[in-house]
């Protein structure tokens, strides 16, 4: 359906809420999201959305993939078990920092964010160690070594700018 002036669009219905819950449950089941042991527990957008939607358990079988944790960077860690592939890190690194260190690799369940053509993050020649990627991560996938997300003051002022840039490029 093409967008028209005066069009009425429903963004909140029982059917849409059901779909939102299902998508969120699939995100939880796809990777190893165990909130009680996560560095982002209590400060995670995925967890907050699940609470808002009233999700108390997942109706899909968990996959429990063996995803790697890259702690090779001197300041930061990426835990692929917690990544939801939102690509905020990719976009902030490219559009705000201008480094384009992050990218996506693989398809489907094998997809993951990578640095410099799948080099360990600590060996990246393009990473400026600015930490912008860590600050925009909605889960505990990117975090500072030795700190929980609760200890970090997340600076997310980049998010409205990313939306604006995307709209200008379209």
Q: Which residue ranges define each predicted feature?
A:
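Fe-S ferredoxin-like electron-transfer domains
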Residues: 1-126, 135, 140-170
């Amino acid at each position: 359906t093409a967008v028209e002036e005066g069009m009425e669009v429903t963004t909140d219905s029982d059917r849409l809420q059901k779909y939102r819950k299902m998508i969120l449950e699939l995100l939880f089941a796809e990777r190893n999201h165990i909130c009680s042991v996560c560095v982002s527990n209590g400060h995670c957008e995925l967890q907050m959305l699940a609470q808002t939607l009233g999700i108390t358990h997942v109706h899909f079988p968990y996959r429990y993939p063996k995803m790697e944790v890259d702690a090779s960077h001197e300041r930061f860690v990426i835990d692929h078990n917690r990544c939801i592939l939102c690509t905020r890190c990719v976009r902030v690194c490219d559009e705000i920092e201008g480094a384009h260190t992050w990218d996506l690799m693989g398809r489907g369940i094998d997809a993951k964010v990578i640095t410099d053509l799948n080099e360990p993050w600590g060996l990246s020649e393009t990473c400026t160690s600015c930490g912008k990627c860590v600050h925009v991560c909605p889960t505990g996938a990117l975090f500072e070594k030795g700190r929980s997300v609760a200890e970090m003051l997340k600076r997310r002022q980049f998010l409205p700018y990313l939306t604006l840039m995307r709209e200008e490029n379209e």
